[in-house]
Amino acid sequence: MKKKIIVALILTAVCLTAVLGAAACSNTELVGFDIELANAVGEDLGVSVEFAQINWNTKENELESKNVDLLWNGMTITPEREAMWEISEPYMLNEQVAIIRKADESKFDTKDKMLSSDKWAAESGSAGAELIGDLGATLIGVNAQISVLTELNSGSADIGVMDSVMANYYINESGSTYSSSLMVSPVKIATEEEYYGIAARGGEVALMDKINTSLAKLWADGTISDIAEKYGLSDVVLPIEYTSQWDSITDKSSWDYIAARGKIIIGYTLFAPIAYEVEAA
């Protein structure tokens, strides 16, 4: 019998179109790069995968209280998170980008002009929100990255900051809701690239070694590349190579606990093309 992995999905409270993803909608199917990758890892580890919901703003509490076992949601690897948690090998490249209204392209064609505005929007607690703080700009915090785009369209914000992976999907996809009114600014606001990783509680090395070993196997056999191509992410997915160090850990209790319990809980947010819902066939 397969064991069960529960992947916690942090969903927004509104239903969106199939292009934008959806949450709490009837007759929908959960799809996306991370969703398919999690399913592939589950199959490789001999466990089934189930998706549940948490609040991303309380992800630290959810992880430390053992409501979830992994955070796996296009999560940016940071030194603070590496010090606090066990972090997987990076599996995707990302950067923070500025989103503006097309009508404001000339108004905000330099970083200095952007910084003249006191209306910058980003998801609270995100890498984008942190960057806005680093720039000395005034943050309008929203509860999900997708809400950054609605703030811009409504005029409540002048500049939005979000992951390039998500921005390219929502804005550059032909026919998407925001492609006619918004644009990814060519102005660079971030000095460094970012990397996505998966987090486990600090000390749970054996569990993370299992995840890393599976990811390396799925890279080697082409599974990750196939999933990336499906979601238009071939140019940002990163290779993961196996290292024997992942088999050298003697304390395997964190994985043994999961295996004995028969399920693992992972935190997600609604984040196309990483995780989103479409109408079920």
What kind of feature is each model-predicted range?
Residues 92-100, 175-212, 234-250:
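Periplasmic-binding protein-like
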